[in-house]
């Protein structure tokens, strides 16, 4: 990947000039001037997904200039580098190949002169065999009973992805009950174990190194709980490992035959497609897990092969850069109108902020422009009764992605029609608003005297011109969810490539862990500490006096 400062390109300068022409343009006028705007500013994927980006503060000229930025920063070369196994994560000297995990075409992908696909396929085959034994009941616990509950113990990418997907695909789940434990706060594991029986519980310990503090603390507590009923030799029937550290796995008591490997070129927040997704395969069955991979692979091909003007991840990435760097928008909201998707925003909060929350470029120099945005969101319509007020009438510009399926898995009365009426209404309201004239007319039509309501009119005005993307899926299936996740992954990659940052490391998580490891021994006794700054000393000493 090349090291090109985007602000030094001719395209960036052209975008700055273009912004001066666009900053006061209203979305309503863009529609008024172009009867075909929806058709021109939307694109489909596989006849299963439509992305409508027409309600944005953009014109065809805007997109041309943004695409020129992608060309001048050599985005296509970066895409080829990732797909070909080049070590684009240079700070850790690693390839970035989550695309290999779902490479359903099985074409060779080479890292260090070796095709990785045979190993990928071997782990998938092992996951298939294992999941089928658990689901069928062939696998027995230490008292001869079948497994009924599965507890995934992980954190970050080893938790967020599998949890999000198993929730999003609950309509496809089998009889196994899934539980996810991540927080080192003992409450999380304690509350989970209260409802379980050691005889019928399987634990998946997800840690590449088998040393992650939070995960291993929870894993040891789970083992202690298990050993109140079972024996040490029974651990192997109730614990499996998603790891690469065979020695540590064996020492823990897990049979290495039940260790599922993944590789350095699998980043944590891109790992649900790997052995880390074993909980997904157990929840929805391996066949559906394969469909998830297939949907993601189809989006990979779309991303790699589709021209930029119709390439969904690239379009979304460019529009995001437009708002973040030219309009000064600091956040993006992800708003799924589907209750099963309630963890989707949280998943891509990590996916985006841990990937592109960087302040130095690929040359190690501080940047003079905006990199990753703040990502947040909740399912609709709950968010409408929480934070939409600020999106509609606040002083912050918050570009939003609205996501909804046309067909619900629960055809309950008119629930889905009501849900989707809100989905359509919100993007219309955000784009077009309600003028003072309309507010005054509504009062007049209601028989109100203009003078008597004059004081309230300003509060009922909606300026509009708030940008949104609408992502409409036929329905949420393993295949379509896989494609949707991959689309957002590639959007994040595209933004990082153009903005000249390393997307696939996460050094920002290290300092806090390092300091915590120094503080932990200081909490072992009641002695006052004085080795930190005044605030930290004061907090630690008060904690010691209160505990």
UniProtKB/Swiss-Prot annotation:
This is Glucose-6-phosphate isomerase. It is an enzyme of class 5 (isomerase). InterPro entries: G6P_Isomerase, G6P_Isomerase_C, Phosphoglucose_isomerase_CS, SIS_dom_sf, SIS_PGI_1, SIS_PGI_2. Belongs to the GPI family. It holds the Pfam family PGI. The active site is at 354 (proton donor), 385, 513. HAMAP family: G6P_isomerase (MF_00473). It is found in: Cytoplasm. Signal peptide: none annotated. Coiled coil: none annotated.
